[in-house]
């Protein structure tokens, strides 16, 4: 594991390990390669129900936002008490997460976007409002510098991105700590576990267990 340099080959290696475990547990991550070049990226798509009677925001706790494996399962259960009053307005949000390698910063970068099923995208303000409350204090000093909209370097489409300027700093601390306790880590797993929850992307604990068992 490189302490000072995280090259693209290392990025692809750790992504491959990550995706192997994802396939074992059916978590939906896959690797895609651009047709015009050899560059590739890791990606996942998931659907959530947004209940507007409970919250107007995206990225709220799992009790409000329910992850859906497919587009078909979009109906909300209705009990007798709900029949006697107007049904809550529910909308389905499609979330796309892409993990790419940044040659400039030499670290992985999380690109993401969210849209309704009719294709209407969520605005940057909606994305920021959907950031979980426990992460907002850390980002409030510069939310628009932390979550920005950029062109996807491979797809050429607008995506939101978590700026990678601090990635090397906090990942160096993570890697040094893992060395002290002689623990094997997958760079992508450790990094995504830290940055993913900021935008509603959570990894099952089995990823960390799989990394430890691969020593």
From Swiss-Prot:
Statement: the UniProt record of this protein carries the keyword Metal-binding: no
Gene Ontology BP terms: autophagy; protein transport
UniProt GO cellular component terms: cytosol
Origin superkingdom: Eukaryota
Keyword terms, alphabetized: Autophagy, Cytoplasm, Protein transport, Transferase, Transport, Ubl conjugation pathway
Disulfide bond positions: none
GO terms assigned for molecular function: Atg12 conjugating enzyme activity; Atg12 transferase activity
Catalytic machinery residues: 165 (glycyl thioester intermediate)
InterPro entries: Atg3/Atg10
The protein's enzyme class: transferase
Compartment annotation: Cytoplasm
EC number annotated for this UniProt entry: 2.3.2.-
Assembly notes: Interacts with MAP1LC3A. By interacting with MAP1LC3A, it plays a role in the conjugation of ATG12 to ATG5. Also able to directly interact either with ATG5 or ATG7.
PANTHER family referenced in this protein's UniProt entry, alphabetically: UBIQUITIN-LIKE-CONJUGATING ENZYME ATG10
Function: E2-like enzyme involved in autophagy. Acts as an E2-like enzyme that catalyzes the conjugation of ATG12 to ATG5. ATG12 conjugation to ATG5 is required for autophagy. Likely serves as an ATG5-recognition molecule. Not involved in ATG12 conjugation to ATG3. Plays a role in adenovirus-mediated cell lysis.
Family, as annotated: Belongs to the ATG10 family.
Protein name: Ubiquitin-like-conjugating enzyme ATG10
Gene that encodes the chain: Atg10
């Amino acid at each position: 594991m490189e302490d000072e340099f995280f090259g693209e080959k290392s990025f692809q290696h750790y992504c491959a390990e990550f995706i192997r475990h994802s396939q074992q547990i059916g978590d939906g991550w896959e690797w895609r390669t651009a047709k015009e070049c050899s560059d590739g990226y890791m990606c996942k798509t998931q659907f959530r129900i947004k209940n507007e009677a409970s919250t107007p925001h995206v990225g709220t706790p799992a009790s409000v936002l329910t992850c859906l494996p497919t587009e078909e399962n979009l109906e909300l259960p209705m009990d007798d008490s709900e029949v006697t009053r107007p049904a809550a307005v529910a909308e389905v949000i499609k979330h796309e997460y892409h993990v790419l390698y940044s040659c400039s910063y030499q670290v992985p970068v999380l690109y993401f976007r969210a849209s309704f099923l009719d294709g209407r995208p969520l605005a940057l303000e909606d994305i920021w409002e959907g950031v979980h409350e426990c992460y907002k204090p850390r980002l409030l000093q510069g939310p628009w510098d932390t979550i920005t909209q950029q062109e996807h370097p491979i797809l050429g489409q607008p995506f939101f991105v978590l700026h990678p300027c601090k990635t090397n700093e906090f990942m160096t601390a993570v890697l040094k700590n893992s060395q002290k306790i002689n623990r094997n880590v997958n760079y992508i797993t450790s990094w995504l576990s830290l940055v993913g929850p900021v935008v509603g992307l959570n990894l099952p604990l089995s990823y960390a267990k799989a990394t430890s068992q691969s020593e």
